[in-house]
Amino acid sequence: QMKAAAWNNTAPTFDEYLISLTAKEIAAGVENAVWNGTAAASGSFQGFLGAGGTFQTDATINNVVNAGTPFVQSNVIANMSKALAAVPSTVYGKEDLRMYINYKTYRLYISEISKLGYVNAYNMNSDYVPVFEGVKLAVSYGMADDRIVVAEKSNLFFGTDLLSDQTEIRTLDMSNLDGSNNVRIVAKYSAGV
């Protein structure tokens, strides 16, 4: 049993700690799968971008592909502008329109606007709201490098089953089963976009 302290944010038992640590790893994997997952991979699901790095195209999706050049500080604003230029005018003013980028792109963007002296971004005080040309930025952990998605957040769906018997996470002490000093973790859940 771990003792309480003012700055102790660990779980009181080892089992609870192990489950919380595993849940964080699972959450990171799900965040990655939301954007980059492929249905062909065992234990994964088809993400928004999938293996090709672009949405499945239909008449309502404009895939703007970077010409193979990685994003750097000097071209990040041009790439963001190129992505916004493909947004139809009927969508551009929508309140829930977001530009989804990863932390590399966000860091490059902040660095570039800081260099240009935009709204004192080099200071990054609490007044700054991340926007680009009037569109709010949504920084996403799981998104791959050199990708930009501009979409209404109401058009991106993530689903999971939280209430069934098929959703669980628990530890399994192997000492009673095979005499070993091992602990296994069982995690069952379903998710998809």
Can you name each region flagged by the protein language model?
Residues 49-78, 98, 110-193:
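Sequence/fold signature of self-assembling virion shell proteins
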Residues 2-85:
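Alpha-helical scaffold segments that mediate packing/assembly in large oligomeric complexes
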Residues 25, 29, 33, 87-95, ...:
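Short secondary-structure junctions and interdomain/linker hinges
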Residues 78-113:
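Ordered core of a single globular domain
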Residues 34-39, 94-102, 122-124:
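Short coil/turn segments at secondary-structure boundaries
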Residues 27, 31, 103, 139:
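Internal mixed-charge
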Residues 6-12, 85-92, 141-144, 149, ...:
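Short, surface-exposed loop and linker segments with low hydrophobicity and enrichment for Pro/Ser/Thr
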